[in-house]
């Protein structure tokens, strides 16, 4: 049977790998989207390198939404989204193993299972529903319509759309940036919220701040990862207390998600793109120095 440390490592690795698999599918998809746009641009009337201001060109542009949506929501992308959603259930099962290894017991209330179902539906909607129209399809259509109305340079129009749809060596495309945030945050928040629901049922007092460090790890997580904390101290962070050097003013820290408080801290933790989590543990695992810190803060006798 895998140890607590081994399970934590597996769980933490998945918090990075699972969203990344979906993001890789988006990178592959961007080429198809750009090819479709290039094909559309070839149908426009152009004179001296500039797009002709005409009803015919506007009519050509007007069909782009439906065409782009078909290309964007292609079979490969839909399969990747479906696979991503199924990983929420697998992550919950791994969390069950981690909790049992850390506490020696496990109780999964029905609310935890129901929550995972809700989290999956929300993620799927964000990845294939109306937000995609708002974040990607309509902005591209807007770029093309403006190019026609203003008689813009075809070369400059193609360059602008390429940056928007495919990105470059300095910036991600608009859609990749969006999918990165949605996939990273939805998976990590679901992971933490599931654990929080189970922990509440177990009435646990101590938690291990789990996860590794990556290039984008911020001060808040960097100072806490690998340590154990009493739940009262964790909740104090949500209230803007005990932040140490990470307090950027007003009881806030860099990357903090709006709406973080003593209740939501268990789900939001370090903030946007945070891949860390709080795992319930037995007090037997907690060091004397960590208990002393909690005692000095007035959280335990």
Describe these PLM feature segments:
Residues 170-286:
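Acidic, glycine-rich two-metal-ion catalytic cores of nucleic acid-processing enzymes
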Residues 1-172, 263, 279-301:
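N-terminal leader/targeting and assembly helices and adjacent pre-domain segments
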């Amino acid at each position: 049977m895998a140890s607590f440390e081994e399970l934590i490592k597996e769980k933490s690795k998945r918090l990075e790998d699972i969203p990344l698999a979906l993001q890789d599918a988006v990178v592959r998809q961007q080429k198809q989207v750009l090819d479709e746009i290039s094909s559309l641009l070839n149908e426009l009337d152009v004179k001296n390198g500039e797009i002709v201001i005409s009803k015919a060109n506007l009519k050509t542009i007007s069909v782009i939404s439906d065409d782009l949506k078909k290309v964007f929501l292609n079979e490969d992308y839909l399969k990747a989204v479906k696979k991503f959603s199924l990983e929420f259930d697998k992550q919950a099962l791994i969390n069950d193993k981690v909790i049992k290894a850390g506490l020696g017991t496990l109780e999964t209330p029905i609310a935890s299972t129901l929550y995972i179902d809700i989290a999956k539906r929300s993620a799927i909607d964000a990845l294939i529903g109306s937000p995609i129209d708002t974040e990607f399809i309509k902005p591209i259509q807007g770029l093309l319509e403006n190019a026609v109305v203003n008689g813009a340079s075809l070369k400059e129009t193609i360059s602008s759309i390429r940056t928007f749809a495919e990105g470059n060596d300095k910036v991600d495309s608009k859609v990749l940036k969006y999918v990165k945030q949605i996939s990273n945050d939805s998976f990590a928040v679901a992971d933490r919220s599931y654990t929080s629901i189970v922990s509440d049922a177990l009435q646990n007092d101590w938690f291990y701040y789990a996860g590794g460090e990556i290039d984008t790890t911020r001060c808040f997580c960097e100072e806490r990862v690998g340590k154990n904390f009493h739940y009262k101290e964790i909740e104090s962070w949500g209230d803007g207390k005990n932040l140490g050097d990470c307090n950027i003013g007003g009881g806030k820290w860099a990357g903090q998600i709006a709406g973080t408080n003593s209740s939501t801290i268990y789900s939001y933790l370090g903030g946007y793109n945070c891949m860390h989590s709080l795992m319930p543990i037995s007090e037997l695992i907690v060091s004397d120095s960590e208990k002393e810190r909690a005692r000095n803060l007035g959280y335990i006798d």
